[in-house]
Amino acid sequence: SSSNVYVVADIELGADNRIWVGTRQNYLQTATDKGGGRIMYSDNGTTFTVAYSHTNQAGRVKVACAPSSAYTLYAVFEANGKVDTLIRTHNKGKTWISVSKPKDADTGIPGTDPSRGQAWYDLSLAVSPLDTTVVMAGFVDVFQTQNKGLAWLQVGKWSNNSGLANLSCAYVHADIHTFTFKPGSTECLIGTDGGIFYAPDVMDNMTNQAVIYEANNGFTVTQMYWGDISQTKGKDLMLAGAQDNGTNQLATSGLCNENMISGGDGGYCFISQTNDNKQIVSYVYNQFYSTTNNWTANAKIIDDATTGKFINPAVWDDLNGYLFTGKSKVTIYRNKLGTSATLATTVTVNGTAANGAPSAFCSSISSAGKTQLYVGTDVGKLYVTTDAVASAPTWKDITGSTGSAIPAGNISCIHRLRLSDTLFVTISNYGSTANILMSVDAGVSHCAEEVQLGTLGLNWLTGQ
Protein backbone atom coordinates (compact mmCIF):
# COMPACT_ATOMS: atom_id res chain seq x y z
CA SER A 1 0.00 0.00 0.00
CA SER A 2 3.00 2.33 0.37
CA SER A 3 4.34 4.38 -2.51
CA ASN A 4 7.98 3.56 -1.77
CA VAL A 5 7.95 -0.25 -1.98
CA TYR A 6 8.18 -2.73 -4.83
CA VAL A 7 5.08 -4.67 -5.85
CA VAL A 8 5.57 -8.41 -6.30
CA ALA A 9 4.49 -10.15 -9.51
CA ASP A 10 6.26 -13.49 -9.00
CA ILE A 11 8.10 -15.36 -6.22
CA GLU A 12 10.28 -18.39 -6.97
CA LEU A 13 12.65 -20.54 -4.91
CA GLY A 14 16.07 -21.42 -6.29
CA ALA A 15 17.71 -24.83 -5.93
CA ASP A 16 19.71 -23.41 -3.01
CA ASN A 17 16.57 -21.93 -1.36
CA ARG A 18 17.43 -18.40 -2.44
CA ILE A 19 14.24 -16.37 -2.87
CA TRP A 20 13.84 -14.76 -6.28
CA VAL A 21 11.23 -12.07 -6.95
CA GLY A 22 9.95 -10.46 -10.13
CA THR A 23 8.24 -7.10 -9.65
CA ARG A 24 5.51 -5.17 -11.42
CA GLN A 25 4.65 -1.50 -11.44
CA ASN A 26 3.46 0.12 -8.22
CA TYR A 27 0.70 2.47 -9.32
CA LEU A 28 0.66 4.21 -5.94
CA GLN A 29 4.13 5.46 -6.79
CA THR A 30 3.96 9.00 -8.18
CA ALA A 31 7.47 8.97 -9.63
CA THR A 32 8.14 8.00 -13.24
CA ASP A 33 9.91 4.85 -12.04
CA LYS A 34 7.16 2.75 -10.49
CA GLY A 35 9.38 -0.17 -9.56
CA GLY A 36 8.45 -2.59 -12.32
CA GLY A 37 10.93 -4.58 -14.37
CA ARG A 38 13.10 -5.71 -11.44
CA ILE A 39 14.53 -9.10 -10.53
CA MET A 40 15.43 -9.26 -6.84
CA TYR A 41 16.75 -11.93 -4.50
CA SER A 42 17.13 -12.63 -0.80
CA ASP A 43 18.95 -15.30 1.17
CA ASN A 44 17.24 -14.47 4.47
CA GLY A 45 13.77 -13.27 3.48
CA THR A 46 14.41 -9.87 5.04
CA THR A 47 16.93 -8.07 2.87
CA PHE A 48 16.44 -8.02 -0.90
CA THR A 49 18.97 -7.05 -3.56
CA VAL A 50 18.19 -5.97 -7.12
CA ALA A 51 19.88 -8.43 -9.49
CA TYR A 52 18.52 -6.94 -12.69
CA SER A 53 16.73 -3.72 -13.60
CA HIS A 54 15.09 -3.36 -16.99
CA THR A 55 16.33 -0.23 -18.74
CA ASN A 56 12.87 0.67 -20.07
CA GLN A 57 11.15 0.27 -16.70
CA ALA A 58 9.03 -2.66 -17.83
CA GLY A 59 6.07 -3.88 -15.85
CA ARG A 60 5.41 -7.49 -14.86
CA VAL A 61 8.34 -9.92 -14.52
CA LYS A 62 8.12 -13.73 -14.41
CA VAL A 63 11.14 -15.67 -13.14
CA ALA A 64 11.95 -19.37 -13.69
CA CYS A 65 14.60 -21.09 -11.55
CA ALA A 66 16.32 -24.24 -12.79
CA PRO A 67 15.55 -27.05 -10.29
CA SER A 68 18.89 -28.72 -11.02
CA SER A 69 21.12 -25.66 -10.71
CA ALA A 70 21.02 -22.70 -8.35
CA TYR A 71 23.05 -20.74 -10.89
CA THR A 72 20.59 -20.83 -13.79
CA LEU A 73 17.50 -18.64 -14.11
CA TYR A 74 15.37 -17.37 -16.94
CA ALA A 75 13.04 -14.35 -16.88
CA VAL A 76 10.50 -12.70 -19.14
CA PHE A 77 9.40 -9.05 -18.97
CA GLU A 78 6.11 -7.44 -19.89
CA ALA A 79 5.94 -3.80 -21.00
CA ASN A 80 2.78 -2.01 -22.10
CA GLY A 81 0.95 -5.31 -22.22
CA LYS A 82 3.43 -6.95 -24.59
CA VAL A 83 6.24 -9.48 -24.23
CA ASP A 84 9.24 -7.17 -24.10
CA THR A 85 12.41 -9.09 -23.20
CA LEU A 86 13.64 -12.56 -22.22
CA ILE A 87 16.96 -13.04 -20.39
CA ARG A 88 18.94 -15.79 -18.68
CA THR A 89 21.80 -16.12 -16.23
CA HIS A 90 24.12 -19.00 -15.41
CA ASN A 91 25.96 -17.35 -12.50
CA LYS A 92 23.11 -16.52 -10.10
CA GLY A 93 22.37 -13.15 -11.63
CA LYS A 94 25.85 -11.64 -11.76
CA THR A 95 25.50 -11.31 -15.53
CA TRP A 96 22.51 -11.73 -17.82
CA ILE A 97 22.24 -12.77 -21.47
CA SER A 98 19.47 -11.81 -23.88
CA VAL A 99 17.22 -14.62 -25.12
CA SER A 100 15.26 -14.59 -28.37
CA LYS A 101 11.47 -14.31 -28.26
CA PRO A 102 9.27 -17.12 -29.59
CA LYS A 103 7.29 -16.32 -32.73
CA ASP A 104 3.75 -17.66 -32.99
CA ALA A 105 2.64 -19.25 -36.26
CA ASP A 106 -0.79 -17.67 -35.80
CA THR A 107 -0.96 -14.86 -38.37
CA GLY A 108 -3.18 -12.91 -35.98
CA ILE A 109 -0.42 -12.77 -33.36
CA PRO A 110 2.41 -10.26 -33.95
CA GLY A 111 5.79 -11.82 -34.57
CA THR A 112 7.33 -9.61 -31.89
CA ASP A 113 4.71 -10.33 -29.23
CA PRO A 114 3.58 -13.94 -28.67
CA SER A 115 1.14 -12.74 -25.99
CA ARG A 116 -0.89 -10.67 -28.49
CA GLY A 117 -0.93 -7.71 -26.12
CA GLN A 118 -1.89 -9.84 -23.12
CA ALA A 119 1.44 -10.26 -21.31
CA TRP A 120 -0.22 -8.72 -18.25
CA TYR A 121 -2.30 -11.92 -18.31
CA ASP A 122 -0.70 -14.89 -20.09
CA LEU A 123 3.00 -14.99 -19.22
CA SER A 124 4.79 -18.10 -17.94
CA LEU A 125 8.18 -19.85 -17.92
CA ALA A 126 9.52 -23.10 -16.47
CA VAL A 127 12.89 -24.86 -16.65
CA SER A 128 13.12 -28.63 -17.00
CA PRO A 129 14.18 -30.35 -13.74
CA LEU A 130 16.71 -32.42 -15.67
CA ASP A 131 18.25 -29.98 -18.14
CA THR A 132 18.96 -26.26 -17.68
CA THR A 133 18.89 -25.70 -21.45
CA VAL A 134 15.27 -26.85 -21.80
CA VAL A 135 12.63 -24.22 -21.07
CA MET A 136 8.86 -24.13 -21.54
CA ALA A 137 7.27 -20.75 -22.29
CA GLY A 138 3.59 -19.91 -22.35
CA PHE A 139 1.78 -16.93 -23.82
CA VAL A 140 -1.27 -17.42 -26.05
CA ASP A 141 0.36 -20.72 -27.10
CA VAL A 142 3.04 -23.09 -25.77
CA PHE A 143 6.70 -22.98 -26.83
CA GLN A 144 9.82 -24.95 -25.97
CA THR A 145 13.55 -24.34 -26.37
CA GLN A 146 16.21 -27.01 -25.97
CA ASN A 147 19.18 -24.68 -26.42
CA LYS A 148 18.78 -21.91 -23.82
CA GLY A 149 16.47 -19.83 -25.99
CA LEU A 150 18.61 -19.62 -29.10
CA ALA A 151 15.66 -21.12 -30.99
CA TRP A 152 12.06 -21.91 -30.04
CA LEU A 153 9.65 -24.59 -31.21
CA GLN A 154 5.90 -24.04 -31.02
CA VAL A 155 4.53 -27.16 -29.32
CA GLY A 156 0.92 -26.12 -28.70
CA LYS A 157 -1.74 -24.30 -30.71
CA TRP A 158 -5.08 -22.97 -29.57
CA SER A 159 -6.79 -23.15 -32.97
CA ASN A 160 -6.51 -24.26 -36.56
CA ASN A 161 -6.95 -20.79 -37.97
CA SER A 162 -4.70 -19.04 -40.47
CA GLY A 163 -1.09 -20.06 -39.96
CA LEU A 164 -1.89 -22.77 -37.43
CA ALA A 165 -3.83 -25.23 -39.58
CA ASN A 166 -0.66 -26.69 -41.10
CA LEU A 167 1.35 -26.57 -37.88
CA SER A 168 1.96 -30.09 -36.57
CA CYS A 169 1.61 -29.91 -32.81
CA ALA A 170 -0.94 -30.60 -30.10
CA TYR A 171 -4.04 -28.58 -29.33
CA VAL A 172 -3.62 -26.67 -26.07
CA HIS A 173 -6.23 -24.14 -25.00
CA ALA A 174 -5.27 -20.49 -25.39
CA ASP A 175 -3.67 -18.39 -22.64
CA ILE A 176 -0.99 -20.28 -20.74
CA HIS A 177 -0.56 -19.41 -17.07
CA THR A 178 1.66 -22.04 -15.49
CA PHE A 179 3.85 -25.10 -16.01
CA THR A 180 4.36 -27.60 -13.20
CA PHE A 181 6.99 -30.32 -13.60
CA LYS A 182 6.97 -33.52 -11.60
CA PRO A 183 10.16 -33.29 -9.45
CA GLY A 184 13.09 -35.02 -11.12
CA SER A 185 11.05 -35.72 -14.24
CA THR A 186 10.12 -34.31 -17.62
CA GLU A 187 6.41 -34.90 -16.98
CA CYS A 188 4.60 -31.58 -17.02
CA LEU A 189 1.17 -30.13 -16.30
CA ILE A 190 0.13 -27.01 -18.18
CA GLY A 191 -2.43 -24.61 -16.73
CA THR A 192 -4.56 -22.68 -19.25
CA ASP A 193 -7.79 -20.75 -19.57
CA GLY A 194 -9.27 -24.07 -20.69
CA GLY A 195 -8.08 -26.05 -17.69
CA ILE A 196 -5.26 -28.60 -17.38
CA PHE A 197 -3.18 -30.20 -20.12
CA TYR A 198 -0.68 -33.02 -19.56
CA ALA A 199 2.65 -33.68 -21.29
CA PRO A 200 4.03 -37.12 -20.28
CA ASP A 201 7.49 -36.13 -21.52
CA VAL A 202 8.40 -32.66 -22.78
CA MET A 203 11.48 -34.17 -24.42
CA ASP A 204 9.29 -36.32 -26.64
CA ASN A 205 8.77 -35.32 -30.26
CA MET A 206 6.75 -32.19 -29.49
CA THR A 207 5.67 -31.76 -33.11
CA ASN A 208 3.60 -34.91 -32.60
CA GLN A 209 -0.01 -33.97 -31.93
CA ALA A 210 -0.41 -36.81 -29.43
CA VAL A 211 2.22 -35.75 -26.89
CA ILE A 212 0.09 -33.24 -24.98
CA TYR A 213 -3.33 -34.29 -23.75
CA GLU A 214 -6.31 -32.44 -22.35
CA ALA A 215 -6.76 -33.55 -18.74
CA ASN A 216 -10.07 -32.03 -17.70
CA ASN A 217 -12.28 -35.09 -17.36
CA GLY A 218 -14.55 -34.32 -14.41
CA PHE A 219 -12.56 -31.19 -13.62
CA THR A 220 -15.25 -28.52 -13.71
CA VAL A 221 -13.52 -25.23 -13.07
CA THR A 222 -14.78 -23.08 -15.95
CA GLN A 223 -15.61 -19.54 -14.85
CA MET A 224 -19.08 -18.43 -15.88
CA TYR A 225 -19.83 -14.76 -16.47
CA TRP A 226 -23.55 -15.17 -17.07
CA GLY A 227 -26.27 -17.73 -17.60
CA ASP A 228 -29.96 -18.26 -18.28
CA ILE A 229 -32.36 -21.14 -17.88
CA SER A 230 -35.49 -22.22 -19.73
CA GLN A 231 -38.80 -21.33 -18.12
CA THR A 232 -40.39 -24.49 -19.55
CA LYS A 233 -41.34 -26.75 -16.66
CA GLY A 234 -39.29 -29.94 -16.48
CA LYS A 235 -37.01 -29.01 -19.38
CA ASP A 236 -33.21 -29.16 -19.18
CA LEU A 237 -32.06 -26.16 -21.18
CA MET A 238 -29.47 -23.63 -20.11
CA LEU A 239 -27.08 -21.13 -21.65
CA ALA A 240 -23.80 -20.23 -19.96
CA GLY A 241 -21.30 -17.57 -21.04
CA ALA A 242 -17.82 -18.66 -19.93
CA GLN A 243 -14.48 -16.91 -19.55
CA ASP A 244 -12.50 -17.79 -22.69
CA ASN A 245 -14.57 -20.96 -23.12
CA GLY A 246 -17.40 -19.65 -25.25
CA THR A 247 -21.14 -19.63 -24.69
CA ASN A 248 -22.42 -23.14 -24.14
CA GLN A 249 -25.88 -24.62 -24.37
CA LEU A 250 -26.73 -27.48 -22.02
CA ALA A 251 -29.79 -29.36 -23.23
CA THR A 252 -29.43 -32.59 -21.24
CA SER A 253 -28.92 -33.23 -17.55
CA GLY A 254 -25.45 -33.56 -16.08
CA LEU A 255 -22.15 -31.80 -16.63
CA CYS A 256 -19.89 -31.98 -19.68
CA ASN A 257 -22.82 -32.33 -22.10
CA GLU A 258 -22.61 -28.84 -23.50
CA ASN A 259 -22.83 -27.63 -27.08
CA MET A 260 -20.69 -24.56 -27.79
CA ILE A 261 -22.78 -21.90 -29.51
CA SER A 262 -19.99 -19.36 -29.88
CA GLY A 263 -16.29 -19.39 -29.05
CA GLY A 264 -13.82 -17.09 -27.33
CA ASP A 265 -15.19 -15.27 -24.32
CA GLY A 266 -18.85 -15.90 -23.66
CA GLY A 267 -20.88 -13.20 -21.96
CA TYR A 268 -24.47 -12.24 -21.32
CA CYS A 269 -26.94 -14.72 -22.78
CA PHE A 270 -30.70 -15.15 -22.72
CA ILE A 271 -33.47 -17.69 -23.39
CA SER A 272 -36.95 -16.41 -24.18
CA GLN A 273 -39.45 -16.84 -21.36
CA THR A 274 -42.12 -17.97 -23.83
CA ASN A 275 -40.26 -19.73 -26.67
CA ASP A 276 -37.13 -21.79 -25.99
CA ASN A 277 -36.08 -21.58 -29.64
CA LYS A 278 -35.46 -17.85 -29.27
CA GLN A 279 -32.08 -17.15 -27.68
CA ILE A 280 -29.35 -14.51 -27.55
CA VAL A 281 -25.62 -14.97 -26.86
CA SER A 282 -22.74 -12.51 -26.84
CA TYR A 283 -19.03 -12.20 -27.45
CA VAL A 284 -16.90 -9.36 -26.05
CA TYR A 285 -18.04 -5.73 -26.17
CA ASN A 286 -21.16 -5.16 -28.30
CA GLN A 287 -21.24 -8.35 -30.34
CA PHE A 288 -24.59 -10.05 -29.79
CA TYR A 289 -26.06 -12.93 -31.79
CA SER A 290 -29.68 -14.11 -31.89
CA THR A 291 -31.64 -17.08 -33.13
CA THR A 292 -35.32 -17.88 -33.49
CA ASN A 293 -34.83 -21.59 -34.26
CA ASN A 294 -32.41 -22.87 -31.60
CA TRP A 295 -29.27 -22.01 -33.63
CA THR A 296 -30.19 -23.70 -36.87
CA ALA A 297 -29.59 -20.18 -38.14
CA ASN A 298 -28.45 -17.02 -36.40
CA ALA A 299 -27.79 -13.35 -37.03
CA LYS A 300 -26.03 -10.49 -35.31
CA ILE A 301 -28.48 -8.27 -33.49
CA ILE A 302 -25.80 -5.78 -32.37
CA ASP A 303 -22.42 -5.57 -34.10
CA ASP A 304 -19.91 -3.15 -32.56
CA ALA A 305 -16.55 -4.42 -31.29
CA THR A 306 -15.40 -0.98 -30.16
CA THR A 307 -17.93 0.06 -27.51
CA GLY A 308 -19.27 -1.31 -24.25
CA LYS A 309 -17.42 -3.21 -21.56
CA PHE A 310 -15.31 -6.32 -22.24
CA ILE A 311 -18.10 -8.48 -20.80
CA ASN A 312 -20.89 -6.10 -21.67
CA PRO A 313 -24.02 -5.88 -19.49
CA ALA A 314 -27.34 -6.39 -21.23
CA VAL A 315 -30.98 -7.22 -20.64
CA TRP A 316 -33.56 -8.72 -22.97
CA ASP A 317 -37.23 -7.80 -22.68
CA ASP A 318 -38.37 -10.68 -24.82
CA LEU A 319 -42.06 -9.94 -24.24
CA ASN A 320 -41.67 -6.80 -26.32
CA GLY A 321 -38.68 -8.22 -28.18
CA TYR A 322 -36.01 -5.65 -27.33
CA LEU A 323 -32.39 -6.15 -26.31
CA PHE A 324 -30.61 -3.36 -24.41
CA THR A 325 -26.81 -3.24 -23.96
CA GLY A 326 -24.27 -0.78 -22.58
CA LYS A 327 -22.57 1.39 -25.19
CA SER A 328 -20.75 4.39 -23.74
CA LYS A 329 -20.69 6.61 -20.68
CA VAL A 330 -23.96 8.28 -21.70
CA THR A 331 -25.64 5.82 -24.07
CA ILE A 332 -27.02 2.32 -24.54
CA TYR A 333 -27.83 0.23 -27.62
CA ARG A 334 -31.36 -0.95 -28.40
CA ASN A 335 -32.50 -3.42 -31.04
CA LYS A 336 -35.31 -5.89 -31.60
CA LEU A 337 -34.92 -9.62 -32.10
CA GLY A 338 -35.12 -10.43 -35.80
CA THR A 339 -33.87 -6.98 -36.81
CA SER A 340 -30.58 -6.39 -38.60
CA ALA A 341 -27.68 -5.20 -36.45
CA THR A 342 -27.37 -2.21 -38.78
CA LEU A 343 -30.67 -0.94 -37.40
CA ALA A 344 -29.57 -0.93 -33.75
CA THR A 345 -30.48 2.38 -32.12
CA THR A 346 -28.33 4.46 -29.78
CA VAL A 347 -30.32 5.78 -26.80
CA THR A 348 -28.99 8.54 -24.54
CA VAL A 349 -29.52 7.84 -20.84
CA ASN A 350 -27.81 10.82 -19.24
CA GLY A 351 -25.98 13.83 -20.57
CA THR A 352 -22.68 13.75 -18.71
CA ALA A 353 -19.86 11.22 -18.88
CA ALA A 354 -19.12 11.78 -15.18
CA ASN A 355 -22.25 9.76 -14.39
CA GLY A 356 -20.54 6.62 -15.64
CA ALA A 357 -21.07 3.82 -18.14
CA PRO A 358 -23.89 1.25 -17.92
CA SER A 359 -22.94 -1.65 -15.65
CA ALA A 360 -26.31 -3.30 -14.88
CA PHE A 361 -29.84 -3.44 -16.26
CA CYS A 362 -33.28 -4.51 -15.10
CA SER A 363 -36.44 -4.53 -17.20
CA SER A 364 -40.09 -5.02 -16.32
CA ILE A 365 -43.41 -4.59 -18.08
CA SER A 366 -45.63 -1.75 -16.92
CA SER A 367 -49.41 -2.04 -16.53
CA ALA A 368 -49.64 -0.35 -19.92
CA GLY A 369 -47.53 -3.12 -21.47
CA LYS A 370 -44.52 -0.88 -22.00
CA THR A 371 -40.88 -1.70 -21.25
CA GLN A 372 -39.78 -0.15 -17.97
CA LEU A 373 -35.99 -0.13 -17.90
CA TYR A 374 -33.54 0.50 -15.06
CA VAL A 375 -29.91 1.33 -15.88
CA GLY A 376 -27.15 1.35 -13.25
CA THR A 377 -23.69 2.76 -13.90
CA ASP A 378 -20.15 2.02 -12.77
CA VAL A 379 -20.05 5.10 -10.53
CA GLY A 380 -23.27 4.37 -8.64
CA LYS A 381 -25.89 6.25 -10.65
CA LEU A 382 -29.33 4.70 -11.20
CA TYR A 383 -31.80 5.74 -13.91
CA VAL A 384 -35.26 4.56 -14.97
CA THR A 385 -37.58 5.11 -17.91
CA THR A 386 -41.18 3.96 -18.19
CA ASP A 387 -40.99 3.48 -21.96
CA ALA A 388 -37.59 2.27 -23.12
CA VAL A 389 -38.74 1.68 -26.71
CA ALA A 390 -39.98 5.22 -27.27
CA SER A 391 -38.12 7.16 -29.94
CA ALA A 392 -36.59 9.36 -27.21
CA PRO A 393 -37.19 7.82 -23.77
CA THR A 394 -37.53 10.13 -20.78
CA TRP A 395 -35.12 9.16 -17.99
CA LYS A 396 -35.35 9.85 -14.27
CA ASP A 397 -32.38 9.82 -11.90
CA ILE A 398 -33.37 7.66 -8.92
CA THR A 399 -29.94 7.43 -7.30
CA GLY A 400 -31.46 9.09 -4.24
CA SER A 401 -30.69 12.15 -2.18
CA THR A 402 -28.05 12.65 0.52
CA GLY A 403 -28.65 10.29 3.41
CA SER A 404 -30.70 7.84 1.38
CA ALA A 405 -28.68 7.59 -1.82
CA ILE A 406 -26.80 4.75 -3.49
CA PRO A 407 -23.09 5.16 -2.61
CA ALA A 408 -20.46 5.75 -5.28
CA GLY A 409 -19.37 2.43 -6.76
CA ASN A 410 -20.06 -0.09 -9.49
CA ILE A 411 -23.72 -1.10 -9.60
CA SER A 412 -23.49 -4.82 -10.37
CA CYS A 413 -27.12 -5.88 -10.13
CA ILE A 414 -30.59 -4.33 -10.15
CA HIS A 415 -33.55 -6.48 -9.14
CA ARG A 416 -37.19 -5.47 -8.83
CA LEU A 417 -39.63 -7.74 -7.05
CA ARG A 418 -42.65 -8.79 -9.06
CA LEU A 419 -45.82 -6.71 -8.67
CA SER A 420 -44.04 -4.45 -6.23
CA ASP A 421 -42.24 -1.13 -5.91
CA THR A 422 -39.44 -2.88 -4.00
CA LEU A 423 -36.10 -2.54 -5.71
CA PHE A 424 -32.70 -4.00 -4.77
CA VAL A 425 -29.29 -2.78 -5.92
CA THR A 426 -25.87 -4.35 -5.28
CA ILE A 427 -22.46 -2.65 -5.35
CA SER A 428 -19.42 -4.77 -6.30
CA ASN A 429 -16.71 -2.52 -4.81
CA TYR A 430 -14.93 -3.84 -1.74
CA GLY A 431 -14.97 -1.27 1.04
CA SER A 432 -18.23 0.34 -0.06
CA THR A 433 -20.30 1.89 2.73
CA ALA A 434 -23.25 -0.26 1.64
CA ASN A 435 -23.28 -3.16 -0.82
CA ILE A 436 -26.95 -4.18 -0.78
CA LEU A 437 -29.52 -1.41 -0.91
CA MET A 438 -33.30 -1.65 -0.89
CA SER A 439 -35.91 0.82 -2.00
CA VAL A 440 -39.59 0.27 -1.18
CA ASP A 441 -40.73 3.32 -3.12
CA ALA A 442 -39.40 2.48 -6.60
CA GLY A 443 -36.15 4.36 -6.07
CA VAL A 444 -37.19 7.52 -4.27
CA SER A 445 -34.95 6.50 -1.36
CA HIS A 446 -32.56 3.63 -0.63
CA CYS A 447 -31.40 2.03 2.60
CA ALA A 448 -28.56 -0.40 3.32
CA GLU A 449 -29.78 -3.97 3.83
CA GLU A 450 -26.75 -6.24 4.26
CA VAL A 451 -26.29 -8.00 7.58
CA GLN A 452 -22.87 -9.25 8.75
CA LEU A 453 -21.39 -8.97 5.26
CA GLY A 454 -18.96 -6.23 6.20
CA THR A 455 -17.51 -4.46 3.18
CA LEU A 456 -17.62 -7.39 0.75
CA GLY A 457 -18.18 -6.58 -2.89
CA LEU A 458 -21.37 -8.23 -4.18
CA ASN A 459 -22.20 -9.12 -7.76
CA TRP A 460 -25.71 -10.48 -7.77
CA LEU A 461 -28.95 -11.15 -5.93
CA THR A 462 -32.33 -12.47 -6.96
CA GLY A 463 -35.77 -13.04 -5.51
CA GLN A 464 -39.46 -13.18 -6.36
Enumerate the predicted regions with their spans.
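Beta-propeller blade termini and top-face loops
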Residues: 1-464
